[in-house]
Each structure stands twice: as structure tokens, then as C-alpha cells.
């Protein structure tokens, strides 16, 4: 099973509260990564930007599926 499918399966098992916490943690991590890049304190791993953004998008999609707001 690919990493993406494992993540989606894991996200679908979480409750809405757990999904909110997961989204919040990932947004905080993305913000701190952007701050590090702006301050240029460390060598920033740029591939993490897209990884966090995609993870946030996937988790928000699963959250909307649970709320019944996704078409398709």
C-alpha cells in the first residue's frame, strides 16, 4: 500500500475532533517551516512545503467527506 493510501485510510478512521487537531498541527508545522525559510536560520528542506500542503488538503477533504459536504 502506498504512503498516500495509508494516510487516507488513517485519516478516515479519525473523528472530526481528531481531524481538526491533525489539520491544526500540520498548519503550525507549515507556518514554522515558512518562518525558518524567511529567517534563513537553517537549511530548509523545501520538499516539506508541498508535503505539508498536500497532507492538509487530504485531511480537509476527508473532514468534508465526513460532514457530507463533498460532491461526487
From Swiss-Prot:
GO molecular function: structural constituent of ribosome
Gene Ontology biological-process entries: translation
Cytoplasm found in the keyword field: no
Keywords: Ribonucleoprotein, Ribosomal protein
Gene Ontology CC entries for this record: ribonucleoprotein complex; ribosome
Similarity comment: family membership: Belongs to the universal ribosomal protein uL29 family.
Protein name per UniProt: Large ribosomal subunit protein uL29
Gene: rpmC
Amino acid at each position: 500500500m502506498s504512503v498516500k493510501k495509508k494516510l487516507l485510510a488513517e485519516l478516515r478512521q479519525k473523528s472530526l475532533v481528531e481531524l481538526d487537531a491533525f489539520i491544526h498541527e500540520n498548519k503550525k508545522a507549515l507556518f514554522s517551516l515558512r518562518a525558518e525559510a524567511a529567517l534563513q536560520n537553517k537549511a530548509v528542506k523545501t520538499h516539506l512545503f508541498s508535503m505539508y500542503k498536500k497532507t492538509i488538503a487530504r485531511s480537509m477533504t476527508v473532514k468534508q467527506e465526513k460532514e457530507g459536504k463533498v460532491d461526487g
